[in-house]
Amino acid sequence: MKKNNIHIIKMGGTIEFIDPDYQKINDKLMKLDASIDKYLSSLINPHFTYDIQTVCQKDSREINQEDLNKLATAIKSTKQENILITHGTFTMKNTAKFLENFIAKENLNKKIILTGAMIPIIGFSISDAGFNLGYSLASFAVVRPGVYLCMNGGMFKPEEVEKNIELLRFQ
């Protein structure tokens, strides 16, 4: 059985404590390493190979055009077909739309999945982060090339999804 090779690109967001409110808690009380790489290597030990690249570590509301251009360059330069992007949930949809336009313009045949979390991946007994990350990684086996958001057990095209803040879910 062929192993999937996945290129993970980190943009920040709550999933890794890059959120002003959660950062204060972590900095003062917890001091946890909530990185995706630590989570995958120490807790999951997956049956696929991956590499990780950090483009930025920001609250998604602070992501700017320069960050998006760096993300586009990272996607274009990787040889991997499967690309997972961890991202804050506030502007994830905007980034996904940007990437749809980018891969169409560049004629790239890649599977790009964005995911994030409402609660950080480490430090809380209840978090959606591990589930969202696992669901996203498994989704590479069934998706066609394109850009998707994987959140709350759903796989969405950017134009078909909204973040519902009251319900803490994408729908």
What are the roles of these predicted feature ranges?
Residues 2-171:
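Active-site histidine-anchored catalytic micro-motif
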